[in-house]
């Protein structure tokens, strides 16, 4: 997958994941860190009061890493540590610092946030070329179907019918229409979808 490719890149950029709130950005980043790294440092610029002070001094890598280590009091091993800067739109200096942290190369960095575009103008020297920006969206209808237990065989049948201009079997057609109507109401936010899957209550 693309995250595996990013993990193994030489001279990798910071990964910047942007998207609406509550679509699962933080959850998927934590899971990725658990699988791929020995050490994981997470900073949330909304929840971690005072975190912005990490980036108030000089923006050179050594100073920032010293501040980060003092703030989190966690082990940071070069090549084995992922630093996750969540809600980074709240700390423009952190976005500026990414250039120097990426050039330093000791650790990997993932940024995540909402409304990043709104705050671009607040960044004094946005480091173009040091971020790989990925947009994340709510679940689409196919993902919603999978979450509700629709099997691969159903997708295969649908594709066959589409490619060969055949009618979709009646039971399958009616089931999918009901699920589509439900999707219109429930939407694609992962927590809401999971609640529906667990309770079937709208």
Explain the meaning of each model-derived region.
Residues 1-202:
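Phosphate-binding site recognition
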